[in-house]
Amino acid sequence: LKSTLELSHTVFAVTYTYTGYPMVRQMSKMIEAGALGKIQKVDVQYFQGWINTVIHDEEKKKNTWRLQPEKSGISCCMGDIGTHAFDMLEYVTGLRVEQLLADLNFVYEDNKMDVDGNVLVRCTDGVKGVIRASQIATGEENSLIVKVYGEKAGLKCEQENPNYLYLMEEGKPMGVLKPGHTYNSDLSLDGTKLPPGHPEGIFDAMGNIYKGVARAVKGEPYDKREFPGMSAGVRGMNFIEQVIASHAEGNVCKKLEN
């Protein structure tokens, strides 16, 4: 796909949907501007619970395509939601994961697909972090939480509460940034369709990605953060492959391709 795209000179996008949220974009721009200082720690959690009701029932398990290797490939949890967590880490920080070490959970020995796992990552600039993804986190719905800690401050965003971006500073009350206010970046404001105080959600995030693609197709100026492109897609696939390999080879460190 990558070589075909380079020859065709067309536009390619991956719907890593959560990058379309205005406050996720604001988080990215604040980190780029140095609001946190040097990044010291990154923690991304993506927890769901829906497979917990499936994994213990053989009949349900047989009828769930994500748990069938012939339909979903080499991974369930990491391939389904772990890739979103991985992309969010790179999107908001601007860092690139260079190495990883994965420990996956299959619950039952005869289950061929991962349904839970932890991935230690080493990024550019020597930054270390962790990606935790689970589809057996009982009671969780769609809990994607991204936390980035720097020497000066920390930022946290929660997918289930996308209109809030939390700014954490030592010895100060937690700050809450919201969409639509003039203190936000142009990238964030461009993705905001309603006045402050009017909640926006997942369909708006999708629309922001499509809007960026439309600008690219029409040859209009656009910010590279408006939609994930081929590079993000290829890195996501490499992430899945290396996570599975790391676990299968005894939880060893694996390098990601640049």
Task: Show the residue positions of the predicted features.
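C-terminal helix-rich "cap/oligomerization" subdomain common to oxidoreductases
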Residues: 2-7, 198, 208-258
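Predominantly a Rossmann-like dinucleotide-binding segment in NAD(P)-dependent oxidoreductases
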Residues: 7-13, 18-111, 165, 250
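C-terminal glycine/acidic-rich active-site capping loop/insertion
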Residues: 62, 91, 118, 123, ...
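Glycine-/small-residue-rich active-site loops that bind phosphorylated ligands and cofactors
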Residues: 19, 136, 235
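Glycine-rich, aromatic-lined ligand/substrate-binding cores of catalytic
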Residues: 84-87, 92-100, 105-154, 160-163
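Generic recognition of short, well-ordered alpha-helical interface segments
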Residues: 22, 80-84, 95, 128, ...
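Conserved loop-to-helix N-cap of the C-terminal "lid" that shapes the substrate pocket in Rossmann-like
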Residues: 79-82, 203, 227-233
